[in-house]
Amino acid sequence: MARPHRVRLRGPAEPPRRGHLPFADAPGVPDPIEVGSRVLTRGGRPWFPVSGEFHYSRYPAGEWEEELLKMKAGGVTVVAAYVIWIHHEETEGRVRFDGDRDLRRFAELCARHGLDFIPRIGPWVHAEVRGGGLPDWVLARTAAPRTDDPAYLAPVRAWYRAIAEQLRGLDRAGGGPIVAIQIENELYDQPDHLLTLKRMAQEAGLSAPLWTSTAWGGVRLPPDELLPLYGGYPETFWTEADGGWPDTCRKHFFFTHQRDDEGIGADLRPTTVRGGDPEELSDRFPWATCELGGGMAVAYHRRPRVEAADVGALGLTKIGCGSVWQGYYMFHGGTNPPGDLTPLQESHATGYPNDLPRLTYDFQAPLGEYGQYRPSYDELRLQHLLLADFGGLIAPMESVLPERLPTGQHDRETLRWAVRADDRSGFLFVNNHQPHEPLPHRPDTSFEVEFPGDGPVLSLPSAPVTIPQGAYFCWPLRLEVAGLRLDWATAQPVCTVDDGHGRTILVLAATDGIAPELALDLRTVTTVSAPSDAEVTTAGDRALVTALRPGTDALVEVDTADGRRVGVLVLDAATARGAYRGPAWGAERLILSADGGVVFDAHADEVRLHSAAGEPSFAVLPAPRRAPVVPGALVKEAEDGVFVRYTVVAGDDGRTGDDVLPVTLVRPAGEAPPVTTGVMGRASVPAEAYFDSAAAEYRVALPDDPPPGTLLRLHWTGDVGRAYVGERLVADQFYSGRVWEIGLGRLPVGELRVRVLPLAGGAPVYVPGRVGDAAIPAELLRAECATVRPWPLRPG
């Protein structure tokens, strides 16, 4: 038998520092925010924010509110958004904050739904936008943008004043949602300019307890003026087509205490920096992030595919590494506005090293360009439920690495794991997933965790297990819930919920391929009752629950020594990925939905289920006294373990399934365009003329008056696809092997034409699944539409 993987928790070498940083709310602000060396606090309590990036100016304003509710239901507590200057002032002096550019309304919607807000005000933001967000007229005025050149600072000062006017009264001193403001972006070597920008923003009237800066690339910051925020992506669009999977991405699937990622933005830095953490940053500031990859954009020359497990494993690994702020870029995709004068995407034509699609900025995000739910949304929501209940416990815990560590970033044989713990309890993190190069199964695995003091070493599980390929998880150690101490469990904490009868239920998610076991501290327990198929054995001060079949009925009931009632419910992994918790019909409830996404709308006093199923179902704990009501539909109910399951039977035909649409070939493709290159010798998007002369053209017969939420799904191959209504470009895509989705509700009335260019053999373009440098023909193979219907679930 292999020897256990072991870690010894010695406690911190020195206590965390407090009061040494100037970040704080104004006097008198309720629940003031403060920053210590290892943790953020709010109202004196550890605070573990979860921020998600959503660019309001890349999304229809009429849909903002529902998308913010989706983000909140996904566990996002803070919405971050670039304020993209060129979107607001493409023409000098014509500053627009109307429609999709209404910054104030967006911030107010965040506040309305209890979400904090972080405007990332630039002025240079990157964001794969033309000029990094700097309008052309600004760049024409100065030879030294992003410096203290007076010719640059003058328009920036006016821009900051315009932002401040929009956000007036929305700071925390005024009861508003703004918890932080980011200055600039990826500016690593000009601390004096960063300080100038901060002072200008403050003089303009902007205010927040936290002023932040991106901190990757060996950043130099003005001392104690900006909170450094870090990032990490599972893939890149900005590296070379033939460069393979970058080591700077590989590192994020290991447990490490190195915060910096020297790879982010490296294509725009004139010098090569070596990743590292200046001692004054890592010792003075907590590990906070703003750009953990929720997905990845695609460039013409490099089109990475990011899968849900890539996003989920990276996020969970960062918590194990010591993160106290999970910030995702992007959490929600969008579409570039068309621009009045020029296209607004990053491109070779503007001197940038990457050609991006003109319109789509989907980013393969957890919520897509048209609000689509992605599997990565479920993976992250499961982690965010954990943080909502236990983040305050985890945040001050130190990250401790085990005795045996991987020998380097190409070591696939050594188990990757870490523990977050204090001297009383902790969480054990394991990651056995990475993209591109799968990690092997880990047979005969067990752990020993030695807490400080004279207590016994915690050994788990009861017998060694095999950790499956692709698994990543967090297991609790000595977790106390409502008077019960759970010594350990081989299942991940999800959340707690009151069952409506005075009993607290701790919900756990089983790890695929590993039998769930619960070790209960008998000193906190008087009675234990388990399902009939489970086994309960006792030894010393511990009761061990084994042979538990996870599911909605896998409830272990406990009476605690202090007179409380506790349940431990172990869901199977697939069911747990459909777990939502929020205020519903007068109480906090746990909802399980495998048929679509759930949002909680307290203002409308309803829950909405976004589902493509003809008869969607969902399970609720605790169940309301009367079944929810769906206008125009019948709601059936049935027991489902400790839940009540409701099924919606539509009064209409309820059709939401996929419908195949007629596709007509208007013109076959010609010869693939020759390859041209731009900055850094990277392949460029073919010239506009080729879309008229070389592209295959198809006509897609769209349904008349499609219901809201209808997506067109195009199965295709080729190089570049563009969709038109009349002469207007309405959607575009670089081929990466994925189905191309277009929201029909965004399209003007008219015939849809799709043009597809073929990819030439030998083209220096990375396409996942491409065999060598083979040509890819231009074909629209199938078109279908599917409707995701919002079902309002109202109190019965």
Model feature map: region roles:
Residues 1-78, 777-779, 784-793:
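N-terminal carbohydrate-binding accessory modules
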Residues 64-131, 202-203:
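Aromatic-lined substrate-binding rim segments of carbohydrate-active enzymes
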Residues 93-101, 112, 123-150, 154, ...:
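Aromatic- and acidic-residue-enriched segments that line the glycan-binding/catalytic groove
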Residues 120-123, 172-185, 201-223, 264-273, ...:
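Aromatic-lined carbohydrate-recognition surfaces of secreted/lumenal glycan-active proteins
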